[in-house]
């Protein structure tokens, strides 16, 4: 299993997380912590804390920590500022984040309750930009600008452990002769005749590393994650002793990486925040049993109904005694009142 198969923090939007899901995963680093932040869209009037990591934004209510949200950077479509109406601050400039997760759009509005502080905007925007510009650490890449003057263009925090000449890429019937690099974050191969014919495979995207028999003899076979396209790549390394040594080294580096991934999001605040565990309020177990089966209402307040072309037809509500717009499938009037309260 690749590290990516277990990674959800940067590629998901989740609500009402458990205490375990609020904790940082291996490789996740807390970059900034902002107190007195209101979730104006979903919990207007509720003072909370915003946590900025290298993978996501977390917000939780200070009054009730199980009221929370996690927004992965990979889901973000747009970040901007706009005027919002806060119950605690009135009309003020707020951070607006539009996201898309599993074909559903959510929008979030966060307001800093400390007047005159731009830190909410600068922190989130800068870290998201750092995430967007460091995708080479995390994404499977074909035909990228990897090589300069026959040398691998190293990423920050990247170190080359081995460079092997005369490695055949077995993607075609004849094979292509090239150079193979093993680093602490990825595997890179490029053709000697044309260095723009290349591939970069981060350990994050590697599902399996094996030695298999092929029509060219024994070969190194790397299978990438389903998210990257499920590629199966073969490389011929001679002699066999060097092949076995390389596979052993790659497996060892992959194991080290899996224990402590390098995601490449490099951004530091002048003041270091406390660890996330120290900042998250412990969740208190209530005597009330909460039935979460089939509950679709927790995040209804965050829906960005961007696909709605016109108002839905009005229907008479016996509960309210007046005509209302027909609700979307799966939602009830009672559920909407629960979100409001």
Curated annotation (Swiss-Prot):
Its main location: membrane. Keywords: Bardet-Biedl syndrome, Cell membrane, Cell projection, Ciliopathy, Cilium, Cilium biogenesis/degradation, Cytoplasm, Cytoskeleton, Disease variant, Intellectual disability, Membrane, Obesity, Protein transport, Sensory transduction, Transport, Vision. GO terms for molecular function: phosphatidylinositol-3-phosphate binding; RNA polymerase II-specific DNA-binding transcription factor binding. GO terms for cellular component: axoneme; BBSome; centriolar satellite; ciliary basal body; ciliary membrane; cytosol. It is found in: Cell projection, Cilium membrane; Cytoplasm; Cytoplasm, Cytoskeleton, Cilium basal body; Cytoplasm, Cytoskeleton, Microtubule organizing center, Centrosome, Centriolar satellite. It comes from the Eukaryota. Part of BBSome complex, that contains BBS1, BBS2, BBS4, BBS5, BBS7, BBS8/TTC8, BBS9 and BBIP10. Binds to phosphoinositides. Interacts with CCDC28B. Interacts with SMO; the interaction is indicative for the association of SMO with the BBsome complex to facilitate ciliary localization of SMO. Interacts with PKD1. Interacts with DLEC1. PANTHER family: BARDET-BIEDL SYNDROME 5 PROTEIN, BARDET-BIEDL SYNDROME PROTEIN 5. It is linked to Bardet-Biedl syndrome 5: A syndrome characterized by usually severe pigmentary retinopathy, early-onset obesity, polydactyly, hypogenitalism, renal malformation and intellectual disability. Secondary features include diabetes mellitus, hypertension and congenital heart disease. Bardet-Biedl syndrome inheritance is autosomal recessive, but three mutated alleles (two at one locus, and a third at a second locus) may be required for clinical manifestation of some forms of the disease. This is BBSome complex member BBS5. It comes from Homo sapiens (Human). The lineage of its organism: Eukaryota, Metazoa, Chordata, Craniata, Vertebrata.
